[in-house]
Amino acid sequence: MHDITAKDKHVIIIGGGDTGSDCLGTSIRQGAKDVTVLQIMPKEPDERPDNQPWPTFARLYQKTSSMEEGGTYVYSTDSVNFVGSDEEQARVHIEDSTASEGFVADENGHVTGLKVVDVAPGENGPFTRQPGTERVLPADLVLISVGFLHPDTSTLLDQLPVELDKRGNVAR
């Protein structure tokens, strides 16, 4: 097994909670080229909204110490799949095991980007993908830090050899 480092890499962190914030700070301190944190939730307001009057707990935007170190947060965005330089279906090797063919990678099995799409609150579910918003973000290292809201297992996680617990979170 080899050490994983963010040094000189385009890093994408899927998940904007406490663990994602820790990944952001660590990636910056390790010398990443750039770091992008994907948050499926919309950005919280800077000021108390009318529908959350005092003394109700207000969900407000709070900048963490890791955010102050740098990086970019992208809100209301969901990950679709991993991509590579050749844009053909290929297999990605993860710690000597082979994942499903849902991945696209370069000739060496390395992920070079992540396809994402904007989302909005949905009528029949938590989020609806917005047509025409798909794009690819460059990525040499993708860190998955999801779990509090339960990861969507119909996209990226079904492509990985990842075990889920009874609640639908990534098992330890």
Q: What do these predicted regions represent?
A:
Residues 1-8, 103-106, 110, 122-172:
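FAD-site-proximal beta/loop scaffold in flavoenzymes
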Residues 13, 116, 144:
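Redox-cofactor binding/interface segments in oxidoreductases and associated redox assembly factors
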Residues 80-89, 163, 169-172:
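Short, intrinsically disordered, charge-balanced linker/junction segments flanking boundaries
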Residues 41, 49-63, 112-116, 120, ...:
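Flexible glycine/proline-rich, aromatic-decorated loop/lid segments
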Residues 24-81, 90-100:
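Rossmann-like dinucleotide-binding cores of NAD(P)H-dependent redox enzymes
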Residues 7-17:
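Beta1/beta-strand and adjacent pyrophosphate-binding region of the FAD-binding site
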Residues 20:
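N-terminal Rossmann-fold NAD(P) dinucleotide-binding loop
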